Amino acid sequence: MKPTFLKCLQGIDKNHAYRQINIIDIHSRYLIINKPSGIQCNGTKSHSNYLLPQLYKQLKAHFSANNPNYKLNPDQYKVVHRLDKYVSGGLIIARGKNANAFRKSFSNQNTNLSVKRKYIGLVPIPNTVSFKQHLHEFGDLKVQHENEVRYLNRPESVTDKKGLIFKDDSLTEGIINFDIVALPKDDRRNKNTGELVTYSALTKFKILHSMSQVPTNEQISRFPKLYKNKTIYPIIIELETGRKNQIRDHILQAFKVSLLNDDKFIDFKMVQKSNTANINSEVYNSNQIGLHSAYISISKSSFANEYVIPIPEGDEYLWKGFLDENSFIKTINRELITF
């Protein structure tokens, strides 16, 4: 399907540079949009770094171009899942009465609608070792020699140890099922308890070992604290549960390093609200995280669509070496689709 690009919604990143959001597709049941880093999904303030008010303005302009009397009903467009403010990539905006069906599909309650979301993350590993050597240094690797259905759905008992579980000895594919501990602000059921909340979470992943990149001299010169003595590994991630900050949390727990330019995540996670401009990073020129919502597929009995979402304009530098213009290189695209 040929993407439909509309003129920009505007947003402001940490350095107050205007951003562009492209609408990838307008379907009768949903929209697919490409959110740059720095745009906030929740909130209804009429600020340029809040998603929905800008989306309403853009859609009204689009539909009014063909029908000057068109009246946009904001209640017909619902964000059914979210990306962290400094994560980029594809978002589904449900239209009309479809929002509940999408939300149910994320928890496997809707058998008539199937939605898959895959992400690409960048994991910086010390260049003195390979990723596999880095993993072995933990001394506690678990390899589950079972088929995928079994190892994803095996019943948990009180003796099951949660953590990082690889599918086989190649240390390429696996799951992360650490519990996630969060502030009560992240759990609507426990808003006012003042206690930390623990809940289960499950993440599938595939490390693309052969596609790792050594930062260029120019990258190291510009941002030495981010790139020096590092090798960057791309990793494909698919969520089986949808907890807040789940990918960022699971990467740190499983691999003992944060995603690229997410070095302050552990501090941010335990703060109710921060007015600090450098909330994620002090080593790069923005708060952008090396995490991108790169693939969405939506299927129902009457249709089946899939989307590979490019890196938004202005967010490419962090992904240097993994892109062909602003799209992922072919080998990564192929892995995204087939994983």
Curated annotation (Swiss-Prot):
EC number: 5.4.99.43
Active site (UniProt): 84
Reaction(s) this enzyme catalyzes, per UniProt: uridine(2819) in 21S rRNA = pseudouridine(2819) in 21S rRNA
Record localization: Mitochondrion
GO CC terms of this entry: mitochondrion
Stored Pfam families: PseudoU_synth_2
One biological process term in Gene Ontology: enzyme-directed rRNA pseudouridine synthesis
Keywords, in A-Z order: Isomerase, Mitochondrion, rRNA processing
CDD domains to which the protein is assigned, alphabetical: PseudoU_synth_RluA_like (cd02869)
Family: Belongs to the pseudouridine synthase RluA family.
Protein function: Pseudouridylate synthase responsible for the pseudouridine-2819 formation in mitochondrial 21S rRNA. May modulate the efficiency or the fidelity of the mitochondrial translation machinery.
Entry protein name: 21S rRNA pseudouridine(2819) synthase
Species this protein is from: Debaryomyces hansenii (strain ATCC 36239 / CBS 767 / BCRC 21394 / JCM 1990 / NBRC 0083 / IGC 2968)
Gene: PUS5
